[in-house]
Amino acid sequence: MPDELKPHFANVQAHYDLSDDFFRLFLDPTQTYSCAYFERDDMTLQEAQIAKIDLALGKLGLQPGMTLLDVGCGWGATMMRAVEKYDVNVVGLTLSKNQANHVQQLVANSENLRSKRVLLAGWEQFDEPVDRIVSIGAFEHFGHERYDAFFSLAHRLLPADGVMLLHTITGLHPKEIHERGLPMSFTFARFLKFIVTEIFPGGRLPSIPMVQECASANGFTVTRVQSLQPHYAKTLDLWSAALQANKGQAIALQSEEVYERYMKYLTGCAEMFRIGYIDVNQFTCQK
């Protein structure tokens, strides 16, 4: 990879290394920090998060003994589920020190004999052949200018029959917002600025066509795009309710300012999904 492509460590750590204990106040026990999949209405958040992981992994055609690369592995739930359910070897990449330490503990406590590695590194620093790639909730941090480099690397790492499952929030182009009759308000614009400056520094959302075009330009065929839009609104509602229920602990761990900022982020994003300004999609990319 070109020397100038350095991973965005500072931007990612500014959010994800806030405090594991703080995130545990509103995430489910698997600590999965992405859209859940409520296959049934009566599912708990934990059940729905595992269902989402299974939905993603089920699109990869995993076979025992394969090696799966998890780009942006979070606190390790997808990696460990893949090992347990599909009997594969896993490599996880994260830019968060806290997440890397947590996954190291999961790996150390696992009795499964498959190879399990977590690297405090970005995809820009990875160059080992793998059989399948999954990336859930990381693409939003890459930046538009790196999409081609990412898809090019993924294509190079995968075998001839390789598959990548990319799960990412997607945004509408202003033209699409206008065409759908959605209001373009200063409130919406201000909220977006708040998200990319105070919650996810450097974050940029792709559009669906942007992902499809970059994938195709780098040798992939996008065989399926699945939207989970209503599922993210529900996930965010459950997160904000849990954080609100733990307000005292949240303030003790951080501050009232951080608590209010996160409540604004969680409730505001839920509304953005409900209105339709943003979506979340799983892209199945076949080599």
From Swiss-Prot:
Biological process terms in GO annotation: lipid biosynthetic process; methylation; mycolic acid biosynthetic process; S-adenosylmethionine metabolic process
Active site per UniProt: 269
Family recorded in the similarity comment: Belongs to the CFA/CMAS family.
Physiological role: Catalyzes the conversion of a double bond to a cyclopropane ring at the distal position of an alpha mycolic acid via the transfer of a methylene group from S-adenosyl-L-methionine. Cyclopropanated mycolic acids are key factors participating in cell envelope permeability, host immunomodulation and persistence.
UniProtKB keywords: Cytoplasm, Lipid biosynthesis, Lipid metabolism, Methyltransferase, S-adenosyl-L-methionine, Transferase
Entries under NCBIfam families matching the protein: mycolic_MTase (NF040660)
UniProt name for this protein: Cyclopropane mycolic acid synthase 1
Signal peptide from the UniProt entry: none
UniProt xrefs under InterPro entries: CFA/CMAS, CMAS, CMAS_actinobact, SAM-dependent_MTases_sf
Enzyme superclass (EC): transferase
Keyword Cytoplasm in record: yes
Main localization category: cytoplasm
Catalytic activity: a 1-acyl-2-(9Z)-enoyl-sn-glycero-3-phospholipid + S-adenosyl-L-methionine = a 1-acyl-2-(9-cyclopronane)-acyl-sn-glycero-3-phospholipid + S-adenosyl-L-homocysteine + H(+)
EC id: 2.1.1.79
One Gene Ontology cellular component annotation held by this UniProt entry: cytoplasm
Annotated localization: Cytoplasm
Record note on quaternary structure: Homodimer.
